[in-house]
Amino acid sequence: MRLTTVVASVNNNRDYYLFIPKQTLFWKKFGIKFIALFVGTSIPEEIIDCSNNIILWNNNLDINTSFVGQNLRMYYPALLDMPSDELVMITDMDMLPMNSKYYCDGLENFITDDFIYYRYIDGNQIFMCYNAAHPSVWKKVFNINNEQDITKQIYETYNVSYNGVPGSNAWFTDQEIMYKKLIDYPNLKVLNRPIERIEMGEYKNHMERGDENFIANYDDAHFHRSYTNNEHLILNAEKQL
């Protein structure tokens, strides 16, 4: 198997959707296509140039669209049309890749029916970053055959107390669903692969010391929930790629 496609989803929160051009660029550097699922009625003008990498989702708009965005990425990969040896992986919109090795090494050892979870199982949760499978497996695990199935799943799992505040009530619904759906899947492959992640405090320390080419030491960078606040760091990472 080989990783060819990465998917993330977002609503009309500008601090998140401004990541789309850089997600597209960063993954393209590694020969991987990025697809953004945009929850809303239309694509914002400032990212319209990325339209070829954006799929508009205008369903479930009567509930909190942050919830829709968090959960949509679990379901939509089932609808992608890809060759049997290709994988689609999901990610967070504010998480950018620093190399391809972490995501691609060893994938040739897996088969079409495998669901690959890169990290470790945390209680009754499976982290969104990172999971990869062929669309047929996403379809089988989540019982998705069309957009109507996705719309229904999102409504059925919606918690009315969800407020979109990170860490608050129902924030981890997506990770809990992922666990429930996957834990008994016979071809779940848990890699327990350690990850070298750079957070923004550490990134700023590198910059203040005048370090160069340091992103090669990391697998991903978490530009914590804001493109605008971290744009100078993102542009620095782009130069280092």
Name these PLM-found stretches.
Residues 139-241:
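Catalytic core and acceptor-binding pocket of nucleotide-sugar-dependent glycosyltransferases
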Residues 61-88:
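A conserved donor-nucleotide-binding helix/loop in the catalytic core
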Residues 96-127:
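Conserved donor-nucleotide/metal-binding helix-loop-beta segment in metal-dependent transferases, i.e.
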Residues 90-96:
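The conserved acidic donor/metal-binding loop of glycosyltransferases
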